[in-house]
Amino acid sequence: MKKFKCVVCGYIYTGEDAPEKCPVCGAGKDKFVEVKDEGEGWADEHKIGIAKGVDKEVLEGLRANFTGECTEVGMYLAMARQADREGYPEVAEAYKRIAFEEAEHASKFAELLGEVVVADTKTNLQMRVDAEKGACEGKKELATLAKKLNYDAIHDTVHEMCKDEARHGSAFRGLLNRYFK
């Protein structure tokens, strides 16, 4: 038995010859092609790092946009917190929604660049475990310095973020161990 695919709607038919008419979309026999490879290939998909080797100005623009989008995420979330403090919850929610959209933009620039993400989940998890450990240590040092200089509010905020980084790293390590070790 052979398999035939309707190129209009994707319907797969199994038989000796393509059907006269697609039972799903009604396309004629001429719209069927024989399926030769049964692999899981897709017609197209997103690829990480497609900007490698592009024009220097384009590459710099992609990097600048990635940084800008990341900055906007933090800025908009901070603005959302301020709007909440002032009693404007709808404004806060708009900032949060837009921050998420900016995060999506940043993720697309990250994928194009392929510098902070690779096409391998195990490697990405390990990179994040290592990065969160470094971020935790860096924030702990900053919090300790702020405490030493009697900047209590800065110490408290940064120290709490230090603990968040440890939690993030532990979550990533748990996933790494569960799926890859």
UniProtKB/Swiss-Prot annotation:
Notes on how activity is controlled: Rubredoxin (Rd) increases the NADH consumption rate by serving as an intermediary electron-transfer shuttle between NROR and revRbr.
Chemical reaction(s) catalysed: H2O2 + NADH + H(+) = NAD(+) + 2 H2O
Induction data: Up-regulated by heat and oxidative stress (exposure to air, O(2) and H(2)O(2)) (at mRNA and protein levels). Various other environmental stress conditions such as an increase of the pH of the growth medium from 4.5 to 6.2, addition of the salt NaCl or of the solvent butanol, and lowering the incubation temperature also result in transiently increased transcript levels. Is also expressed under non-stressful conditions. Repressed by PerR.
Keywords from the named record: Detoxification, Electron transport, Iron, Metal-binding, NAD, Oxidoreductase, Peroxidase, Stress response, Transport
Keyword presence, Coiled coil: no
Pfam families, per database record: Rubrerythrin (PF02915), RUBY_RBDX (PF21349)
Cofactor(s) recorded in Swiss-Prot or TrEMBL: Fe(3+)
Residues binding Fe cation 1: C6, C9, C22, C25
PROSITE patterns recorded: FERRITIN_LIKE, RUBREDOXIN_LIKE
Molecular function (Gene Ontology), one example: electron transfer activity
Protein role: Functions as the terminal component of an NADH peroxidase (NADH:H(2)O(2) oxidoreductase) when using NADH:rubredoxin oxidoreductase (NROR) as the electron transport intermediary from NADH to revRbr 2. Plays an important role in the oxidative stress defense system in C.acetobutylicum, an obligate anaerobic bacterium. Also exhibits NADH oxidase (NADH:O(2) oxidoreductase) activity in vitro, which is 100-fold lesser than that of FprA1/2 using the same electron transfer components. Therefore, its predominant function is most likely as a scavenger of its preferred substrate, H(2)O(2).
The protein's name in its UniProt record: Reverse rubrerythrin-2
